[in-house]
């Protein structure tokens, strides 16, 4: 079932903010952007964890390109604000590459700050620390939560479903939790859910044969990062396969942009038959 968005968790967000995490939100933002001609766009990460950790920064880089194409970049300020100390906390290398790309384009990153409320009338964002930040266009990464049916089932503890990291079993017999609902310390992204599904299938098969899972879940996978200007990078991460999470960045390059397109096409065909 994945994670759902709790827009109401941030007062004022539904009335005074935009978002591109949902299809409906992306369509509304498409209609809002042409009306933004100058001022400050504030991209706020409203809670953790959230899907696709690079996405807020991808949004900033792509917005930069959009404003350049319209010839109004000099009239606009782009700021990203979030509770993390770095864009991708598990890896200094990837974080620094993102920070360098933001700096090169004049995008400000404000770490260790979280927006907790918007005032749509004064266009001010209130921070958890007590301060405020003014904006002309607010784009939020909404608070995530498990679906209501998972919450009411009793599976969730402290917001997510606790599991055995090796095979993704829950504390209930014969019940697994995989993907975004699972309380494992990995990024919430489809590639990790796909890998988790394979482990769960292997574990069920092994149990039916009277054996044990031969290869535990490692939380390993690759995800792509849009750097703008037609360039794409790829992060290869392993969250659970060693003593500490690891990640490295390949690219960015135009070749990886083509690879990303091929990856998406393959998954659409596999999952949706198109």
Residue ranges, per PLM feature:
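FAD-site-proximal beta/loop scaffold in flavoenzymes
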Residues: 4-37, 132-198, 202-206
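Rossmann-like NAD(P)H-binding beta-loop-alpha module
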Residues: 24-76
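Extended hydrophobic secondary-structure segments that form protein cores and membrane-embedded regions
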Residues: 43-44, 77-84, 219-227
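Active-site substrate-recognition segment that forms the wall
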Residues: 49-50, 54-72, 161, 169-176, ...
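Short, solvent-exposed loop/turn segments at secondary-structure junctions
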Residues: 51, 184-185, 211
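A Rossmann-like FAD-binding core segment of flavoenzymes
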Residues: 65-159, 212
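Active-site-proximal substrate-binding core of FAD-dependent oxidoreductases
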Residues: 205-249
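C-terminal auxiliary extensions adjacent to catalytic cores
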Residues: 234-274
């Amino acid at each position: 079932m994945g994670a759902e968005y709790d827009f109401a968790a941030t007062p004022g967000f539904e009335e005074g903010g935009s978002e591109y995490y949902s299809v409906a939100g992306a369509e509304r933002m498409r209609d809002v952007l042409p009306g933004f001609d100058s001022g400050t766009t504030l991209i706020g990460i409203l809670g953790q964890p959230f899907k696709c950790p690079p996405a807020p920064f991808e949004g900033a880089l792509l917005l930069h390109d959009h404003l350049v194409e319209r010839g109004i970049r000099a009239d606009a300020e782009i700021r990203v604000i979030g509770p993390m100390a770095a864009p991708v906390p598990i890896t200094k290398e990837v974080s620094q590459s993102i920070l360098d790309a933001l700096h090169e384009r004049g995008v400000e990153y404000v770490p260790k700050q979280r927006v907790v409320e918007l005032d749509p009338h004064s266009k001010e964002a209130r921070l958890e620390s007590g301060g405020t930040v003014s904006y002309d266009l607010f784009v939020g990464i909404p608070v995530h939560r498990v679906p209501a049916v998972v919450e009411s089932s009793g599976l969730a503890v402290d917001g997510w479903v606790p599991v055995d990291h090796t095979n993704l079993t829950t504390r209930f017999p014969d019940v697994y939790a995989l993907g975004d609902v699972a309380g494992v310390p990995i990024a919430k992204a489809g590639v990790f859910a796909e890998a988790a599904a394979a482990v769960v299938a292997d574990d069920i098969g092994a149990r039916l044969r009277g054996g044990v899972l031969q290869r535990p879940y490692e939380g390993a996978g690759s995800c792509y990062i849009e750097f703008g200007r037609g360039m794409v990078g790829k992060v290869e991460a392993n969250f659970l396969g060693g003593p500490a999470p690891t990640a490295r960045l390949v690219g960015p390059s135009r070749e990886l942009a083509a690879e990303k397109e091929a990856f998406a096409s393959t998954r659409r065909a596999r999952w949706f038959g198109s």
